[in-house]
């Protein structure tokens, strides 16, 4: 689907304010006249809060913790869907087969998580792979990819472009801990096998999607 955009949004967007979320809605409505949109939402603070509660009351199973994260991401997806309907399919997509059918009939499909043990980064890459899309736009909590955590290391080097192989090497050295870790190895594996480019841009700058569509690079390009 050459006219399809796959867009991943960090859950941190939903921890901010309604005005920023509204800006995304306006952009998606504008783009839907020219493109089909597959949007993947993270769980954000809601997921962290409820996973924290679950642990405090004795839940230790990763399955249940992951399910709480998935449902949190789907609630964020519902927020977007409610503001994008009827352009958007009226509920979060549950699997890739369903997504393929929906994209034939709707301009916009929104997903949270899909299955336990899978990050939203991996979901975004699987969506792109299933739809035959060669690029994922990733609204992240960071402005660029760095060789190490820029909040801890003032000499951290930013990348305008970085290969999947190089980024995998950095991730395996565990130099991107905690909040800074922007993508997981499984997502990179999917991107590599299907030759998908990932473009990182900051979630507080929603208009950068127009720069990306003009061929500009507002953040970091992760290439196969």
From Swiss-Prot:
- Catalysed reaction equations from the record: UMP + ATP = UDP + ADP
Native source organism of the sequence: Staphylothermus marinus (strain ATCC 43588 / DSM 3639 / JCM 9404 / F1)
Query: Where does the chain bind UMP?
Result: 43, 66, 114-120
Under the heading NCBIfam families, the entry gives: pyrH_arch (TIGR02076)
* Name of this protein: Uridylate kinase
Keyword vocabulary terms for this entry: ATP-binding, Cytoplasm, Kinase, Nucleotide-binding, Pyrimidine biosynthesis, Transferase
Q: Which family does it belong to?
A: Belongs to the UMP kinase family.
Activity control note: Inhibited by UTP.
Q: What does this protein do?
A: Catalyzes the reversible phosphorylation of UMP to UDP.
Q: What domain of life does the UniProt record list for this protein's source?
A: Archaea
The record's section on Gene3D superfamilies has:
Acetylglutamate kinase-like (3.40.1160.10)
Q: What Gene Ontology biological process does one annotation of this record name?
A: UDP biosynthetic process
The protein's location, in the record's own words, is:
Cytoplasm
> Which residues bind ATP per the record?
8-12, 44, 48, 140, 146, 149
E.C. code: 2.7.4.22
Q: Does the keyword Protein transport apply?
A: no
Q: Known InterPro entries for this protein?
A: AceGlu_kinase-like_sf, Asp/Glu/Uridylate_kinase, Uridylate_kinase_arch/spir
Subunit structure, as described in the record: Homohexamer.
Residue ranges of the TM segments: none
Its annotated pathway? Pyrimidine metabolism; CTP biosynthesis via de novo pathway; UDP from UMP (UMPK route): step 1/1
- GO molecular function of the protein, one example? UMP kinase activity
Q: What is the main EC category here?
A: transferase
The record's GO CC annotations read: cytoplasm
